[in-house]
Swiss-Prot record:
InterPro entries: Herpes_capsid_2 (IPR002690). It holds the Pfam family Herpes_V23. The keyword ATP-binding does not apply. HAMAP family: HSV_TRX2. GO terms for cellular component: host cell nucleus; viral capsid. It comes from the Viruses. One of its GO terms (molecular function) is structural molecule activity. Keywords: Capsid protein, Host nucleus, Virion. Belongs to the herpesviridae TRX2 protein family. Interacts with TRX1 and major capisd protein/MCP. This is Triplex capsid protein 2.
Length: 300
């Protein structure tokens, strides 16, 4: 059954010619919308609600917003309306690589929708005619998106250590390494050093708490499995950790206790994994670098 995925955004004023031109350059790009309704207004479009001008950005809040928002593709721009196609898991879509900065895409790869971590200005189309700014996300290869998250987390870890006077932290050195992303011979600057640390620090607090709880919930049988595997040399990489494994205490196994611990252990492990989840993911099928477009669908 064909699902009507068309979303129409009605503008309060007619767009200027240069605004139409700038938006038409973005046709084929992914845009988050606040709602899934068929008829919406301009305030629903893009990431302005979580990335306002002259406000320190909270990138963790932006990742969360992207995960919860309705994702759509900008299909058409007219003087009075913007037309989108809502992304659905059962459909394929024509996606264009028209983001700033632009990263090379390749066929049969995984893409991730991330906040505009490379700067708000490059990601924004200002609509003076309507007194609004559309802030676009960036769609980039998943491996690069993971690198962005790693740098974002490490920068905030070191910033917190520096603020707490723990050790000798050279923030200029940290900033140099954590705010630069290298890819295919080019260097990209991450605008994360002026971000609001609230969301990331909360995430790091949760991570520390979860890891502490997980260490206490580790089933005895699982803890004693590591030395057993080492003795039988079932995996060569375990030799690296030979000096780390605790000695077997030789106590009796308790399956009832381990069953309870394993249930909680797995629940908290899933919580930890959710911390590292990035924004929505798209599976790219065939991609043409000449047209900068390819077939894509939402990845589960």
């Amino acid at each position: 059954m064909q699902v009507d995925s068309r979303i129409v955004v009605t503008l309060t004023s007619r767009l200027y010619a240069d605004e139409i031109s700038k938006l038409q350059e973005r046709v084929g790009s992914v845009v988050p919308l606040k709602d899934s309704h068929r008829l919406q207004n301009l305030n629903s479009v893009g990431m302005y609600s979580v990335y306002m001008r002259n406000v320190a950005p909270d990138f963790v809040a932006m990742f969360s917003y992207l995960s919860e928002a309705t994702l759509a593709i900008l299909d058409e721009v007219t003087p009075d309306t913007l037309v989108f196609s809502r992304l659905d898991h059962s459909q394929n879509y024509e996606l264009k690589n028209v983001y700033y900065p632009s990263f090379a895409w390749h066929s049969h790869t995984l893409l991730t929708v991330v906040p505009p971590v490379f700067g708000r200005e490059a990601a924004t189309v200002a609509l003076e005619s309507n007194g609004f700014e559309i802030v676009f996300p960036v769609v980039m290869p998943h491996a690069l998106a993971q690198a962005v998250l790693q740098k974002l987390m490490l920068y905030n870890i070191y910033a917190r250590l520096s603020d707490a006077n723990v050790g000798d932290v050279n923030m200029d050195h940290v900033r140099f390494h954590a705010t630069t992303l290298h890819h295919m011979g080019r260097a990209y600057t991450l605008h994360i050093d002026q971000a609001n640390p609230g969301g990331m620090l909360g995430l790091l607090d949760n991570l520390a708490i979860y890891l502490a709880i997980i260490s206490a919930l580790l089933p005895n049988s699982l803890a004693r499995l590591l030395p057993a595997i080492m003795r039988h040399e079932q995996h060569e990489l375990l030799n690296i950790f030979a000096g780390v494994a605790p000695p077997d205490d030789g106590g009796d196994f308790n399956i009832e206790d381990d069953m309870q611990k394993m249930e909680s252990f797995m629940a908290y492990m899933q919580s930890v994994s959710s911390i590292f989840n990035l924004g929505p993911k798209l599976r790219l099928g065939q991609y043409s670098s000449e047209t900068q477009s390819g077939t894509a669908w939402l990845a589960s």
